[in-house]
């Protein structure tokens, strides 16, 4: 917990220094981003139980873009009243699988063979 508090204090101090020496418009943008992040976190805290939040935060470390998509999906469902109660870890896993299927990327491998002036006749074994 102390590490998180230190990080929060560092961010706050950095924001104060930037506001003091930077553009006032820049500080307003940062404040808006900060408010939006707090709003997102409060909504997610209301719709996810503790184990699901832990899984989502672990996923955020590895795949932030997928986490953002899942968070947006959960927030949208909460705003339209499609969630009944808190989402459990198993429910979050199902949502993650749905998002993975929708955003599945197909990997193609293309071999580029170069023609080299090499003959096998000169090989000495």
UniProtKB/Swiss-Prot annotation:
Function as written in the Swiss-Prot or TrEMBL entry: May function in the process of apoptosis.
GO biological process: apoptotic process; cellular response to transforming growth factor beta stimulus; negative regulation of chaperone-mediated protein folding; positive regulation of apoptotic process; positive regulation of gene expression
Stated name of the protein: Programmed cell death protein 5
Residues found modified as N6-acetyllysine: 63
Location of region: Disordered: 17-36
GO cellular component: cytosol; nucleus
GO molecular function list: acetyltransferase activator activity; beta-tubulin binding; DNA binding; heparin binding
Family: Belongs to the PDCD5 family.
Modified residues (N-acetylalanine): 2
Tree of life domain: Eukaryota
Originating species: Bos taurus (Bovine)
Keywords, sorted A to Z: Acetylation, Apoptosis, Phosphoprotein
Annotated positions of the Phosphoserine modification: 51, 119
